[in-house]
């Protein structure tokens, strides 16, 4: 498997030893979590943003990815538009508001970025078929994405989803050729079912089990810099598993490492009031979020009670001097429908949380008035229009 010049292997976050790219099940020395590492001195900003980095999709940033674009399993994920939201700019009273519309990825979700990296790594194994089946638990979007990218390699995949998962996710997991198990209950039940129901060994595509899913999320940071010519001041990120916060924060830090920028922006994790383990841990000064005992959010994508990347997300927020806010479901859904009405972009319910978080900041007078603000829309509104429409009907519209 060809690897990029700057990639220095998978480093163990516990003992520091370095393992090859195709290591499975954590650090061979101590079992710790593995993280892609790079020789940053070998990367020039021009490698990322100059003429050689031209192309479509996030693989144009392969100078800071483990594998070259020529090896990528890709459907041109990334290169999503940064849409100026003029009404929101006026209403929030800031310099500029942009929506980074991740709904326009191949399967309509930001998770396509990481899945493309994870499956590219699988393709580089000596015998990818020996890894079958690939499996993960998902609230919906990542399961759909996994089925799509695994299908590209012709590998069998299982997505375990809770029964509440959106119909579009369930249907398209099968349409992409993936196998699906619908598990009664909530997301933790689906997560437990992977081990309970799969009789064989499997290759885990779970976030943070593979070192590559949150790694793929970091290209959001690179694209924001490429499109704005500078970093934004504040980025609102809907938060569930922690992989987006951890990944995007790493992307901002790497831009400092290679000398493209001097400082990182403020990153804000937004969670539902009724399921906010990462926000609660951040507010209480805990390193590791406690599982959320009684989740009750309409937004299934954000109902992750015991996030696999919870500690990583909290750590990233602290490193970047970030913030965390919680928002009511009605505000998230109301924000998503307001954006659809006035800004054209179809935000999913989870994406609406980013807009609701920005409104919360506005109401708390937390903006100074000249910021460039980015709202990350993590999913297409076309995935669950019923949830959005129900919200309007509930208001008599
Ligand atoms: Zn180790």
Predicted regions and their residues:
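PLP-dependent amino-acid enzyme catalytic core
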Residues: 1-397
